[in-house]
Amino acid sequence: MVKEIARTIEIPEGVSVSLSQDVFTAKGPKGTVERTFWYPGIKIEVREGEVVVDAESSRKEQKAMVGTFASHLKNLIIGVSEGFECKMNIVYAHFPMQVKVEGKTLVIGNFLGEKKPRIAKILGETKVKVSGNEIVVSGINKEDVGQTAANIEQKTKIKRFDPRIFQDGIYIVQKA
């Protein structure tokens, strides 16, 4: 007895998807995203109004990959229709930080009184807005938005001071 392992993802209005060979493309009001999906024994089909991810057998690793592919496809579809956003707070008590966006980098100046600015990478087509003590990281690719926010948070990690006293830094406060 072979169990059917299939996941279906609904395609919302205003989003069009296509699959050519192993490259999945999603187009929506926010933009276009492409991603390659390939794993032995797993098929992805685009039907009317839905995407179906199915496995040839019911092995444990194929079942896991079906769930992984379904989650990635769902995130691509949500990204082009709604987008992803991550809010961060700039916290300082001892030395006021100057934060600004320069091209594909975020420059953090005067962190803990340091003379040399710290630089965090902005990945892909992610947009970063700085207003007062708040940073908003937004984009259509969930992985790029999350990694950009993590890059910013990591650049302000305190290593040579007591973190109970020096709580300066940039912290993620909300993911949406």
UniProtKB/Swiss-Prot annotation:
It comes from the Archaea. GO terms for cellular component: cytosolic large ribosomal subunit. Keywords: Ribonucleoprotein, Ribosomal protein, RNA-binding, rRNA-binding. Coiled coil: none annotated. GO terms for biological process: cytoplasmic translation. The keyword Ribosomal protein applies. One of its GO terms (molecular function) is rRNA binding. Gene3D superfamilies: Ribosomal protein L6, alpha-beta domain. PROSITE patterns: RIBOSOMAL_L6_2. InterPro entries: Ribosomal_uL6-like, Ribosomal_uL6-like_a/b-dom_sf, Ribosomal_uL6_a/b-dom, Ribosomal_uL6_arc, Ribosomal_uL6_CS2. The keyword Protease does not apply. Belongs to the universal ribosomal protein uL6 family. Part of the 50S ribosomal subunit. PANTHER family: 60S RIBOSOMAL PROTEIN L9, 60S/50S RIBOSOMAL PROTEIN L6/L9. This protein binds to the 23S rRNA, and is important in its secondary structure. It is located near the subunit interface in the base of the L7/L12 stalk, and near the tRNA binding site of the peptidyltransferase center. This is Large ribosomal subunit protein uL6. It comes from Methanosarcina mazei (strain ATCC BAA-159 / DSM 3647 / Goe1 / Go1 / JCM 11833 / OCM 88) (Methanosarcina frisia). The lineage of its organism: Archaea, Methanobacteriati, Methanobacteriota, Stenosarchaea group, Methanomicrobia.
